[in-house]
């Protein structure tokens, strides 16, 4: 398949790499050369790690790289796409603008997928003239190693689109779980309030950062504590997702005060080297 990934950030780079390894032709699109260069470097780092671990033979890596096109040319990249995966910032208005633009640029038969973690697929589909071709494919970070993809069907998404999107995900060696088009879907609907309450435990002085994380590492056998996980996801992503959930589900999803403050200070977790932990 000819895949286009819109956005070369953490998620877009991972989706691009995984699609290349699966044998697809991939164009990754950014709006700024600096962001595009950063994305290319992330993709290159994935290949380097794969080679170092013996996961990918060098010949396969070079062949996969030959199928990558990195570009600032949105319309040109989308012209012959079979499937487009949007992976831009988690903001409904931003994504709607991208989908309206995709609708004009991509072939009429192309599937338009969003990597949104919480935003209504029906809403995004309404920004296009082909809502039956719009579907949610929520990948998890880091994409190359995480085996799950949530598939979200909008109110007008066709069964043919769902089937084709599922087949694409399966070529990546990942498992599909289906979710109704409800804000937050499965994972984030449950995960984000868990992280938010853990931050409130810290805000209220119930326990220390280290002990909160240790409690879930040892008491619930989690691989990562909730505060460390928030840093890994990105505090800006956690905050934006909670705001979307709050808009639809009410005050129980209101972001913790310290989370709002940290994001306003540019403390975004691992991506900015500062969050609940320093990196």
Regions found by a protein language model. Give the residues of each.
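Rossmann-like NAD(P)-binding element
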Residues: 34-35, 51, 55-111, 119
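Rossmann-like dinucleotide-binding cores of NAD(P)H-dependent redox enzymes
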Residues: 28-62, 153-162, 176, 183-191
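Rossmann-fold dinucleotide-binding core
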Residues: 111-180, 185-189
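Hydrophobic/aromatic beta-strand patches that form the interior of the parallel beta-sheet core
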Residues: 27, 69-71, 85, 135, ...
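A general alpha-helix detector
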Residues: 46, 147-148, 194-198, 225, ...
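NAD(P)+-binding Rossmann beta1-loop-alpha1 motif at the extreme N-terminus of oxidoreductases
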Residues: 1-49, 53, 105
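NAD(P)-dependent Rossmann-like dehydrogenase/reductase catalytic/cofactor-binding core
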Residues: 8, 22-27, 159-163, 170-181, ...
């Amino acid at each position: 398949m000819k895949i286009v990934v819109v956005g070369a950030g953490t998620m877009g780079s991972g989706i691009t790499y995984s699609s290349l390894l699966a044998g697809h032709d991939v164009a990754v699109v950014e709006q700024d050369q600096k962001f595009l260069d950063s994305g290319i470097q992330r993709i290159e780092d994935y290949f380097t790690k794969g080679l170092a671990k013996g996961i990918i033979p060098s010949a396969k890596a070079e062949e996969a790289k030959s199928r990558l096109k990195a570009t600032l040319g949105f319309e040109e990249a989308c012209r012959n796409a079979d499937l487009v995966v949007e992976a831009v910032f988690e903001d409904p208005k931003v994504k709607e603008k991208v989908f309206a633009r995709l609708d004009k640029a991509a072939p009429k038969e192309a599937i338009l997928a969003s990597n949104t973690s919480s935003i209504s697929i029906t809403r995004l589909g309404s920004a296009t003239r082909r809502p039956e071709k719009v579907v949610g494919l929520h990948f998890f970070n880091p994409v190359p190693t995480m085996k799950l993809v949530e598939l979200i069907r909008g109110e007008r998404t066709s069964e043919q689109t769902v089937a084709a999107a599922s087949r694409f995900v399966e070529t990546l060696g990942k498992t599909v779980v289906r979710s109704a088009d409800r804000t937050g879907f499965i994972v984030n609907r449950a995960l984000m309030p868990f992280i938010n309450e853990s931050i409130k435990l810290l805000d209220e002085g119930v326990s220390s950062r280290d002990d909160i994380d240790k409690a879930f590492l040892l008491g619930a056998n989690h691989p990562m504590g909730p505060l460390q996980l928030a840093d890994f996801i990105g505090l800006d992503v956690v905050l934006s997702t909670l705001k979307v959930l709050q808009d639809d589900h009410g005050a129980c999803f209101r972001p913790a005060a310290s989370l709002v403050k940290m994001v306003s200070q540019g403390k975004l977790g691992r991506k900015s080297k500062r969050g609940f932990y320093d990196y």
